[in-house]
Each structure stands twice: as structure tokens, then as C-alpha cells.
Amino acid sequence: MSDMIHFDSSWDIRVTDTSLRDGSHHKRHQFTVEEVRAIVGALDGAGVPVIEVTHGDGLGGSSFNYGFSKTPEQELIKAAVETATNAKIAFLMLPGLGIKDDIVIAQDNGASICRIATHCTEADVSIQHFGLARERGLETVGFLMMAHSIPPEKLAKQARIMADAGCQCVYVVDSAGALVLEQVSDRVEALVQELGNDAQVGFHGHENLGLGVANSIAAVRAGAKQIDGSTRRFGAGAGNAPVEAFVGVCDKIGVKTGIDFFAIADAAEDVVRPAMPQECLLDRQALMMGYAGVYSSFLKHAERQAERYGVSSAELLVRAGKRKLVGGQEDQLIDIALELQREAAAS
């Protein structure tokens, strides 16, 4: 079991690029090996220290419910590892969707950072997976998703469960892009106070209210040591905090990331953008997700059901927020669409 965390002494914070995982939602999980090699090469060349690669919903996510991968994710992980010179390759897994054998295979393919995600009230389901990952010498990161939905003190208690299980960095994950500045600071500060030297604290933001970079800076100032982003905002919903903009802001305020601003800007424009089906937009649907607190990966599912049943995707997302749906409940969008359809017919 190793206690080492990949963290250079020249960095103030560590940035993880999630374009090849969170971006999979935006691309409907259609990445090719060639695209992964090109993006990893560009990000690695710019100095990005950690690159996450899996199906958008993590290991084992390729399914009827979440969407099938064009290329098996383990092939993509292997290609990423073979391409990277300095960057470490991470993978995401959700207990109950991915299984422990998936962790073993990902490590055998060269990935070295295991990121385990649960709903923010269900950290206990990750205990066995953190144990396995640490036994195998993997660096561990925990994701407390939909962090806007519970107060800071309760989130901190869930973080303690992950840290005690072997998690080396617990993330405040704003899955819906619903948190606003002080709400990020309050949650990060609560985790920092609870965990002390037992684990680092991280932040993962989305752009659904246009605050991805600002919220990430708020997290850094509150004590976060690891920050997620996606180059060119390549992620679910309106996308993640754009790494190139975040790095530029960090340069201007004196926060060291180890990433070359000009190289990451070139990577965003010349390599990542061509792999995107379209830009990640802060449009009406994405805005509704941030406003109503809806899981960002619901966007494409909502658009599909809205078209199928002839209803408003924005109203569909607002009602999903009122029902407090979480990741894994995408199928309930069909029920809501039928409900809206019936209401329209009766009016």
C-alpha cells in the first residue's frame, strides 16, 4: 500500500483534465483510440499532470441505460497510458455500476489513479473499493456527487467516511453546476477542517450557471489542492470549467499549476475542439440544470426524450430538479415526458 500522491513540489494545486471522461457524455461515448491519443498527447505536452479516461459514467458504464461506447473503455485507457510521457492516467468508477474487477483491469492497462464516485449521502458504498485500490497501490480520489444538495457539515461527515476507507483526496463535486461561490467555499472549508492532514480536498465544477472557473478559484482559496476541468469545456451539460481559462487565471493570480498556458490554449483550439461534435453551450437547457440542480449528464437524455415525446426539454429538466433525481435515474425522464405530454393534451 502506497501513501504517495502524484504532486510536484513546484505546484500549488494539481489539475486533472476530464475531457476524455466527462466529455464522453457530450460525445455520447463515441471516442476513438485515435482521438484519445491525439488529446492525451496535446494535454501531456502542455503539462497537464492527470488525465481521466473512461466512459462518461465510469468503468462499466457502457450500457443500454447510459449509452454504449464506440470503443471499449479499457482500450482507450491503454492507448492513453501508451501515449502519455509525464501525465498520470486516472479512471472513474461508480460502485454498483463498475465492479472491482474493472479496477484491476484498468490498473493492468497502466492507469494509476482510481477515482470512486458516490452520491453525496452514500459514501459508505465506496469503502470496499477504496480498500482494494489502496491494497493494489493505486492513488485514490473520492467524488461526493451532487454536493449542492446537502449542507457543508453533512458533506464533511461523508468525506470522513471516504478518508477513513483509504481515500487520499475527497472532492466536492458540483455535478449540477448549481453551486455559487460562497457555497463552494463553505463546502471546501468544511472538508478541509474535517480531514486535516488525513486527505486532500478537491473540487469538480460545471458551467451550467457560468461559474466553473470562478467556483474553482473559490475552492482553491478555501483550501482545495486538486481541481478538475475539461479543456474547451468538453464535458456534460454546459461543460466543465475550461482548463485553459482556469490556468490563465491561476497564472494571473500567482497560483502555480505546472501547465503552460499557451500550450493548453493551443491544445484546446487545435486538438480538442476538432474531436467535439459541437461546442458545449450555456444554452437554455444547460442553464435550467444549474438553476434547478439537475445532474449534468441528464442533458443529452433530456434532449432525446423531449424530441421523442414532443415536450420542452427545459421543462423536463426543471421537473427532474424538483424530483431531486440523481445519476442513475435517467429513465425517469421518460415518466416526466409522458406526464408533460398528458398535461399538454388536457389543456
Swiss-Prot record:
One of the record's GO molecular function terms: manganese ion binding
Top-level enzyme category: lyase
Q: Which residue ranges does the record assign to the Pyruvate carboxyltransferase domain?
A: 13-265
| EC number of this enzyme | 4.1.3.39
Q: Which keywords does this chain's UniProt record carry? A: Aromatic hydrocarbons catabolism, Lyase, Manganese, Metal-binding
Binding site residues for Mn(2+): D22, H204, H206
List the catalytic residues: H25 (proton acceptor)
- Tell me what reaction this enzyme catalyses: (S)-4-hydroxy-2-oxopentanoate = acetaldehyde + pyruvate
Q: Which domain of life is it from?
A: Bacteria
Quick check: keyword Lyase in the entry? yes
Annotated PROSITE patterns: PYR_CT
Show the Pfam families listed in the entry.
DmpG_comm (PF07836), HMGL-like (PF00682)
Question: Per its UniProt record, what CDD domains does this chain match?
Answer: DRE_TIM_HOA
Residues reported to bind substrate: R21, D22, S175, H204, Y295
Q: Provide the site residues for: Transition state stabilizer.
A: R21
Gene3D superfamilies in alphabetical order: 1.10.8.60, Aldolase class I
Q: Which GO terms describe its biological process?
A: catabolic process; L-leucine biosynthetic process
What the entry lists under InterPro entries is as follows: 2-IPM_HCS-like (IPR050073), 4OH_2_O-val_aldolase (IPR017629), Aldolase_TIM (IPR013785), DmpG_comm (IPR012425), DRE_TIM_HOA (IPR035685), PYR_CT (IPR000891)
> What HAMAP family does the entry give?
HOA
Name this polypeptide is given: 4-hydroxy-2-oxovalerate aldolase 1
Organism from which the protein derives: Rhodococcus erythropolis (strain PR4 / NBRC 100887)
